Amino acid sequence: MDVKNSPSSLNSPVSYNCGQSILPLEPGPIYLPSSYVESRHEYSAVTFYSPAVMNYSIPNNSEDGPGRQTTSPNVLWPTPGHLSPLAIHCQPSVLYAEPQKSPWRETRSLEHTLPVNRETLKRKASGSSCASPATSPSSKRDAHFCAVCSDYASGYHYGVWSCEGCKAFFKRSIQGHNDYICPATNQCTIDKNRRKSCQACRLRKCYEVGMVKCGSRRERCGYRIVRRQRNSDEQLHCLSKTKRNGGPMTRVKELLLSALSPEQLVLTLLEAEPPHVLISRPSTPFTEASMMMSLTKLADKELVHMISWAKKIPGFVELSLYDQVRLLESCWLEVLMVGLMWRSIDHPGKLIFAPDLILDRDEGKCVEGILEIFDMLLATTSRFRELKLQHKEYLCVKAMILLNSSMYPSATAPQEADSGRKLTHLLNAVTDALVWVIAKSGMSSQQQSMRLANLLMLLSHVRHASNKGMEHLLNMKCKNVVPVYDLLLEMLNAHTLRGNKSLVTGSERNLVEDSESKEGSQKPQAQ
């Protein structure tokens, strides 16, 4: 019996073993519809989760010949309504079986059913990014791309559409103890061709696009997802019951914060990280006015993102507005400086204020009094470099600087006293997270205690550099060397009048609200 392809079929011939035919056909040529050629499968005796099925591969067309026989003895032609195991695995919604139709009366294409068609898989296997002429517009619309590197996605993994490479990379990262460090400025481009160049930036982008542990592994984490949903429902029921009874909400919110494990808290701090801010570098050589103008503009932009970062820390917005404003006013320059030190940790002798504003020590000679501050920043950064500060440790240290910055007498009002208890509870949670990060390093107990002490002792050096920087900035403001506006001016005025303030003024109350409106206007300038 001769087998011929229909005019709409693929270019590669498809062989069929007539000895295995179960159809009572008369001898003579028959035409296979294109949908059957397109969706042919081999059913072998393997389980659904076997590597042969999960790692679905298309055989090379060069091996297809007239004499090629299938390796499975139970080959049947799939009906048009049949879905491959790959489609069932990738499809996020429920699939309903379509009524079976006569294959000889209607040839229906599967391009509208399969989320990833054969041409897409062929291009993915060969690594080619060029479009195939056989790809129809509907198949292009149905194809999904990796949210991390923009390559063709193989399925819905860990909560997002991703390719096999990024899925495997994220799996290795969350299962192992990999503390990646970016050799550059933590803003490497991650795409199909450069995704392997920087593991730290690739993992950061995985978290940015929303990849989470067990985000889409329904077949392995179904019980965990159901259990988490049940726990969430119980928490919501508890909250609603407390609201109806009019009882205090403080205890419930503290329980929700306590439910966060140190690992979950660190991941939340990672997701709350502000983006890098770009500032146009002035023409060289620097003058006192040009350098101070660049630094003050950069500080004003970073303040907007810093307030947004603080509000993303679990439990911070539950504090009273008085405590929120006091904490931000007390530590804003320390937070900016420790971020500067982290960006400069891999660049000895340089200060990475921004990706496009990198200064050497000697460039600070043009500004009176700033060279001493540069030396303090470089010395503290060198000490962090000697300790080999890890990214997760940096996240916890920065949060501790914010939460431990208030040095005022305890308030007597019940509301303020309750906020103080929340602040202490939150600071303890961040401290536990730092201890957990250090314990993951595999060091002995004595070495862990010594490392924790060394990191905490460096916070006093950061505070000292911050005080020097504040004095210098106020001096430049008084001399009218550079104009100061917006949030930076608000922070400087608060620092000047801090000793005379006993209540939260109207300008302080508007500090957080003004930052939200300004954040929306400055988002296009941040990377």
UniProtKB/Swiss-Prot annotation:
Tissue: Present in granulosa cells of antral follicles in various stages of follicular growth.
Ranges annotated as NR C4-type zinc finger: 146-166, 182-206
Record Pfam families: ERbeta_N, Hormone_recep, zf-C4
Main location: nucleus
Gene3D superfamilies membership: Erythroid Transcription Factor GATA-1, subunit A (3.30.50.10), Retinoid X Receptor (1.10.565.10)
GO molecular function ontology, one term from the record: steroid binding
Subunit and interaction comment: Binds DNA as a homodimer. Can form a heterodimer with ESR1. Interacts with NCOA1, NCOA3, NCOA5 and NCOA6 coactivators, leading to a strong increase of transcription of target genes. Interacts with UBE1C and AKAP13. Interacts with DNTTIP2. Interacts with CCDC62 in the presence of estradiol/E2; this interaction seems to enhance the transcription of target genes. Interacts with DNAAF4. Interacts with PRMT2. Interacts with CCAR2 (via N-terminus) in a ligand-independent manner. Interacts with RBM39, in the presence of estradiol (E2). Interacts with STUB1/CHIP.
Family designation: Belongs to the nuclear hormone receptor family. NR3 subfamily.
Comment block on domains: Composed of three domains: a modulating N-terminal domain, a DNA-binding domain and a C-terminal ligand-binding domain.
Role noted for this protein: Nuclear hormone receptor. Binds estrogens with an affinity similar to that of ESR1ESR1/ER-alpha, and activates expression of reporter genes containing estrogen response elements (ERE) in an estrogen-dependent manner.
Name by which UniProt lists this protein: Estrogen receptor beta
Organism lineage string: Eukaryota, Metazoa, Chordata, Craniata, Vertebrata
Encoding gene per record: ESR2
